[in-house]
A protein has these predicted regions:
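Intrinsic disorder and flexible/low-complexity segments
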Residues: 159-164, 168-201, 319, 390-447
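Extended, hydrophobic alpha-helical segments in both membrane/secreted and soluble proteins
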Residues: 6, 105, 191-195, 204-269, ...
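Charged, glycine-interspersed solvent-exposed loop segments at helix/strand-loop junctions
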Residues: 29-129, 280, 284-365, 369-375, ...
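Non-cytosolic juxtamembrane linkers/loops
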Residues: 124-125, 130-210, 214-224
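C-terminal long alpha-helix characteristic of the crotonase
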Residues: 84-85, 116-163, 328-334, 363-404
Length: 447
């Protein structure tokens, strides 16, 4: 909720949208059925519900249970924070949420204590001038976000030469860049190469791995896990979790020396699934036929023009089960827990950072600053400079490095699809990437 952020300000001058938290996933099963597409699903984990939109028309009881648990937890943390900053009881805040104040006169937000007063947008600049004692006729210098970022960029480096690297691993974990969008996300081969460079750079004394990922390719997750493990042999590695670090996002995090999460971080989701479409029904509808000549039994394995036979299903489920066992083993080793203990909190279930700390999946609650403090302490250094990786390209370089067709297509799709562009990217990634996925069951938008 936007009010959770604004409530921390010294004064609030706006009508508040305050209505609670909801998670409302889309389900595609009936649509796929109408066009003759069947999703063949293989998974391990009762709560691993990423496949549900393709094979069901509503949430399973297990998924409904976990979603209810974590949105209730997040809402509880939001209301506690707003209660403290605005001096309003949690009970009152829930009453206000149920009243849908945004449909009432704006003065109602002031009466309820969610805002301090009302002010027109055009009057904000003059109000700020009064606060900083500038005459109304004088210019009010305002720093934009870009200006503030440049201020940090121009801070002189510490003379010690010590570097604490903050490596940002954000987005879907993939085996290779997606052609669906202009954003690459966490591309396995690139991240591994970058982490190897950080390992070999003697000036880098510690690494904070900032993970903000719902997961993705199980293969790429395993490769990145190994790269993080190798990096850890040379210098401290601290994971700082963002909005979510779940499934594959947790996979690449679990081996770190210390894991720091926000109370509202979505993490865990220790589970694996595979999902492959069978389009035979569609091809029958439109009059397409299919034939094959092969040298060996499984030569056309994975062909979406036909359903899997029983042998192929058994092979796939065996691979998924083995992948899950490896995932659990990695978590047990990284967290210094038994496999049995991990299995009790795995099954694909998502946890908030607050609960994950109680379960032993994370070590500390806090943000990236706390992770940096821990990294510096473990490295045993005093003077240091924080450097962000991977280096961000400017817009022109990024454009020149992008295939023109892909860039133009992605921008056109983004403008046409609007809020559904993210779902399109997810579907496209599922089509292009490996069939075995370690991914969070959903996208959560808090409104």
């Amino acid at each position: 909720s936007t009010h959770c952020i604004s409530s921390a300000a010294s004064d609030v001058y706006k009508r508040q949208e305050w209505r609670g938290i909801a998670s409302a996933p889309l389900f595609y099963k009936d649509l796929l059925q109408k066009i003759g597409v069947e999703m063949q699903v293989f998974k391990v984990g009762t709560y691993k519900s990423a496949v549900e939109p393709f094979i069901a028309t509503e949430m399973s009881p297990a998924n409904r249970e976990q979603v209810t648990t974590f949105i209730t937890s997040i809402w509880g943390q939001v209301t506690e924070g707003v209660s403290t900053s605005r001096n309003i009881s949690v009970d009152s805040l829930n009453v206000y949420a149920d009243r849908m104040l945004m449909f009432y006169p704006a003065e109602e937000s002031v009466k309820c204590g969610l805002a301090d007063t009302l002010i027109y947008r055009n009057d904000v600049r003059n109000y700020l001038k009064k606060l900083v004692e500038i005459n109304e006729d004088d210019n009010l210098p305002i720093l934009g976000l870009g200006d503030m970022m440049n201020v940090r960029k121009n801070v002189p480096k510490d003379k010690s030469g010590n570097i604490v690297a903050v490596y940002y691993a954000s987005g879907e974990i993939t085996d290779y860049p997606s052609s669906a969008t202009s954003e690459d996300g966490i591309v396995g081969s690139k991240v591994i190469r970058d982490l190897r460079k950080l390992k070999d750079n003697d000036d880098v004394k510690a690494v904070v791995l900032r993970v903000n990922s719902p997961g993705g390719s199980a293969f790429a997750s395993e490769q990145i896990w190994h790269a993080v493990k190798e990096l850890k042999t040379k210098k401290p590695v601290i994971v700082s979790m963002g909005d979510y670090a779940a499934s594959g996002g947790y996979y690449i995090s679990c081996v770190a020396d210390t894991i720091v999460a926000e109370p509202t971080t979505l993490t865990g989701s220790i589970g694996i699934f595979g999902m492959i479409p069978n389009v035979k029904g569609l091809t029958d509808k439109i009059g397409l036929s299919y034939d094959v000549v092969k040298t060996n039994k499984y030569a056309d394995f994975g062909n979406i023009m036909r359903p899997f036979n029983e042998d192929e299903k058994s092979l796939l489920q065996m691979m998924i089960t083995e992948g899950y066992d490896t995932f659990v083993t990695r978590c047990a080793e990284g967290r210094h827990m038994t496999k049995e203990a991990i299995e009790k909190i795995a099954e694909g279930r998502v946890w908030t950072g607050e609960t994950a700390k109680e379960l032993g999946l994370v070590d500390e609650l806090g943000g990236i600053d706390k992770a940096l403090d821990i990294a510096v302490a473990k490295a045993g250094i005093e003077g240091y400079t924080v450097v962000s990786y991977p280096e961000k390209q400017d817009f022109l370089s990024s454009l020149l490095d992008t295939k023109p067709t892909n860039y133009v297509e992605s921008q056109l799709l983004k403008s046409k699809l609007g809020e559904y562009y993210q779902q399109f990217g997810l579907l496209k990634n599922l089509q292009e990437q490996s069939m075995i996925q370690a991914r969070i069951p959903f996208e959560l938008n808090i409104k």
